[in-house]
Amino acid sequence: MLTLDTLNTMLAVSEEGMVEEMILALLASPQLVIFFEKFPRLKNAVTADLPRWREALRSRLKDARVPPELTEEVMCYQQSQLLSTPQFIVQLPQILALLHRLHSPYAAQAKQLTESNSTFTPALHTLFLQRWRLSLVVQATTLNQQLLEEEREQLLSDVQERMTLSGQLEPTLAENDNAAGRLWDMSAGQLKRGDYQLIVKYGEFLAAQPELMQLAEQLGRSREAKSVPKKDAPMETFRTLVREPATVPEQVDGIQQGDDILRLLPPELATLGITELEYEFYRRLVEKQLLTYRLHGEAWREKVTERPVVHQDVDEQPRGPFIVCVDTSGSMGGFNEQCAKAFCLALMRVALADNRRCFIMLFSTDVVRYELSGPESIEQAIRFLSQRFRGGTDIASCFRAIIERMQGREWFDADAVVISDFIAQRLPDDVVSKVGELQRLHQHRFHAVAMSAHGKPGIMRIFDHIWRFDTGMRSRLLRRWRR
C-alpha cells in the first residue's frame, strides 16, 4: 500500500510547512500560554522538546498509509501520464468510470471537461491531467492536515498531563533551569494524580522544615576542592613569619644554645679559663652550641623554606553522585521517617539542579535500592516515599552495600550519606578498615545525618562530617520558636 511520504514525494507536497504551522498553533494555545506565565522555568524545557515533537510528527506522516481509494486513483493517474493523446482517448471511458466508482472529488469536473468539448485535443489532454494532479494535491494536503490535527490533539493532551505533573512538582524539585529541564523529561511517564501527590505532600512537609532543607543544601554542596600531588613536583619557595625572642634584654625567659658571648652562662665562661677545655669552648662557639640566656620579646622575622608543589592538579568542586542509605528500623518511624524521606527529597532536588545522580538504599534486615535521577525517577521516588520504616537495624550491611557500589567506575567520586539515629551495633573491623581506605586513597566522603542526640560515638567516628538534626520534642519546639 502507498505511504503518505511516497505520495507527498510524487506530488511534490511539502509537509514541513504544515508541521511548523501546527507546532506554532500548539505553542499559541491558551493552555500553554497560561502555563508558561505561571512556571517560566519550564518554558525553556518545553521549548527544548520542540525538535523531538517535529521528528515525531515527521515520522507519523512518513509511516501513515494512504487510503485504498486514493492509492488506486494515484496509480491510474501515473499510468495516464504515460499515454499519448490517442491512447488516452481510448482509455478515457474507463478512467471516468474509475473516478466515479472511487467517488473522487475530480470525477464531476472530469466528466464536465469531456462533455463540454466534442473534440479531445492534445491541449485538452494536458489540461485534464493538470487539473487531475491539482485535485490529487488537494486530497494529499487534506490527508496530511487531518493526520496532523489528530497528532496535535494527542500531543496537546500529553503536554497538558505533563504540564500538570511538572507544575505540581516544580516548587519541590526544580531549583534552577537545569532541574526544570530534567523534571520535564521525567514527567513523560504514565502517572496518575494520586501517585505524585505523595511527592507534593512531602514537599509541603519539607517547606515547613526549612532547617532540614538548609541542611540538605549544605551537605550537597559541602565538598571542597582537593589537591592532587604530582610525581617529581618542582620545589617552591614558602615564606612564613615566625616569632622568636627579641635581642633587647627585656626579661630572661630560659636558656638556649647559641654563640652570643654577652649572654653566656657562668659555667660556659669557666671552661674558657681551663687550658684543657679551651679548644672545646671554641668548637662549641663555632657550632653555636654554647648555653646562653634566652631573652623574652615579641620580635618577628620572615622564615624562607622550600617544599614540593602539591597544588598543580586541582579538582575544583567535584560534583559526584549521592549514595544515600536510609535506616528503616522501627526507631526511625513516625516523625523521624517523615524527616528522612523529606531529606532524601531535598537531596534529589540538589542532584537535579547540579546534574548529579542520586541513589537511595534502604537498610534494615535487607537492602532495597532506588534510582532518583534516571528517566523513571518520579516513579522510583513515589515507591520510596511509600515505604514504611518497621524493620531492624543492620548498619554493617549498609556500609558493605556502599563499598560495593563505590567499586564501579561511574561511582568513583560518589559521596555517601547515611541517615539514621545510629542506635545500632558496632561496625566490624573489616568494614571500618575498608571505609578508611576509600576515604584515604580515593577521597570518598562519608556523611552522617544524625536524627538523634543518642547515637553511638563508636559508629559515628567513621564519618568525615556529622550533620545533626535532632528530632526530639525539645529540639522541635526550639526550632519552631526560633522561626
Curated annotation (Swiss-Prot):
Record-linked CDD domains: VWA_YIEM_type (cd01462)
Annotated SUPFAM superfamilies: vWA-like
Main location: cytoplasm
Keywords assigned: Chaperone, Cytoplasm
Chaperone as UniProt keyword: yes
Source superkingdom: Bacteria
Family matches, as InterPro entries: Uncharacterised_CoxE (IPR008912), Uncharacterised_ViaA (IPR023481), VWF_A (IPR002035), vWFA_dom_sf (IPR036465)
Record's subcellular location: Cytoplasm
One GO cellular component term: cytosol
Classification via Pfam families: VWA_CoxE
Record's keyword annotation contains Transmembrane: no
NCBIfam families: PRK10997.1
Function: Component of the RavA-ViaA chaperone complex, which may act on the membrane to optimize the function of some of the respiratory chains. ViaA stimulates the ATPase activity of RavA.
Subunit and interaction comment: Homodimer. Interacts with RavA.
Family matches, as HAMAP family: ViaA
Family statement drawn from the similarity comment of this UniProt entry: Belongs to the ViaA family.
The protein, known as: Regulatory protein ViaA
